[in-house]
């Protein structure tokens, strides 16, 4: 008989560790570069409370092999294997497979064509340790079925039956003493613990952070809830930085904060930042195995706890083993992408100088995110840490004005551009440039500069909303930042108006909840048609249409459909437009041969020969300037990938990235 993977579905906890392990086993034990390459050869199906790992059965007289017109599927080493050289991607095997475990993967080729190939479990035939899914299953529900294994399994079941039959028929059922299974641990996990939070009536009076740090007992309790779902867990995969989450949570359990912070910094140079501002509910916590049973582990607050504790103890990155490789790189933009790139480069012995137009590092972390979400002293401390590591900062320096890109190309071996996106998207409705109408980003930047005691700028003035009736248009996290900022400046009323329903808001549920607690009003299913003006030309309201939810769009979100005859005017003294951002104009790029797309985004890809290299070989780019406005962690991940591309291009030999 052929060998195959056998699963005990009754004990499966649905952690998907087998899927992650499978993909990594076929990618040199590294995470794949993007989600579109995540093709596990084993899949965990969920049907209510039951989880079932499913993969190829390696059938005797396999229908897939019998159906293949090119002889690409055959028996080898007691298993059914696909010869990729012979496969023509015809899908005959997909149709023939009775279990639906065959898949066709289309891979783009360098010449512009594509190769379609059959894809299935190969039992990790070339892997010395055997199938990765079995090795990494934390619940031990997978095994490699062979004739000997099946014989032993049948024998053990017969022996158990014999033991039970030896008991008197009127006796109580005999249960054998065994250690708790992972499934039992999951069902016995205590409820999720949230951090303490300042009362709403207190926090609206200042710009201090509203969440209090975990106390040690809170952190230990929350860390104990982690099931440690494999060496490379699904929470690790869904984090764009692939943080070693279960491993540093385990160090918290052991009371080893310094060990935890070392693990944390292997993949993330700003953990005290991402622990505060990352939308964990959409990433790591959203994938947590115990989410449905008792609530996700509070990963973000544990990440914050580790860094806050370790940095308070005096921990700093150890650079004693780093020696210079004689290369110099300039980084344009001290935001998340630029800082992440600088971290990898300086740890690899490269001399790094970071240029930024702002007076402090962080980019929108510092000037776009309000202080009640992110204390600005954290970035100042992190600048001191980077400086001690050897990174040099040129702040208040605008590339293109204060220094030319061509000069930087002359002075440095390579350049990285991580300038973010600063141009606000418009709604395209009448009077959106009238007095009293503000774009979200200049509003937030002007406020942050005011809170930090910095002078206002002409393009980012401080807007005082005291006593005003403020309406914020939009439903993302930036809209919530504007709502909560206006409330703290004493606005008489603040309303968030969004064209879809609450369930389809793109922002964090936590931020919406906080805004409601602080007194914000919400109007859902309303779409702006026109801004109305007073006699003096200043905005005094928004003409709206009611909407209903229609069919899903290309991204799967239901479209808002205007309701005929539902028009009304919403009064407003100030209107803040929070519709997102596009890349701002960078004319100095084109002169150096850096191509951009129709939206103004720099064209660069993680799948290039040198990751995130642009059309100018000396220049690399990443973050929002490449992909458009996105998350802090995605920008950081791209900065790290670009650093690897730069190191490869400069022929600097470094160990594999964690």
Feature names for model-found ranges:
Residues 433-467, 552-629:
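FAD-site-proximal beta/loop scaffold in flavoenzymes
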Residues 5-21, 25, 48-71, 81-100, ...:
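Cysteine-centered iron-sulfur cluster-binding motifs in ferredoxin-type domains/subunits
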Residues 395-409, 525-537, 548-550:
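A conserved short coil-to-beta-strand element within the FAD-binding core of flavoproteins
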Residues 463-500, 563, 568-574, 581-582, ...:
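Long hydrophobic segments that form regular secondary structure
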Residues 482, 625-653:
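A conserved FAD-binding loop/helix module that cradles the flavin
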Residues 2, 28-66, 84-86, 92-209, ...:
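Flanking helices and flexible, charged tails adjoining ferredoxin-like Fe-S electron-transfer domains
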Residues 190-196, 200-212, 242-253, 264-265, ...:
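Beta1-alpha1 glycine-rich phosphate/pyrophosphate-binding loop at the start
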Residues 248, 273-274, 282-332, 347-348, ...:
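FAD-binding core/adjacent interface of flavoenzyme oxidoreductases
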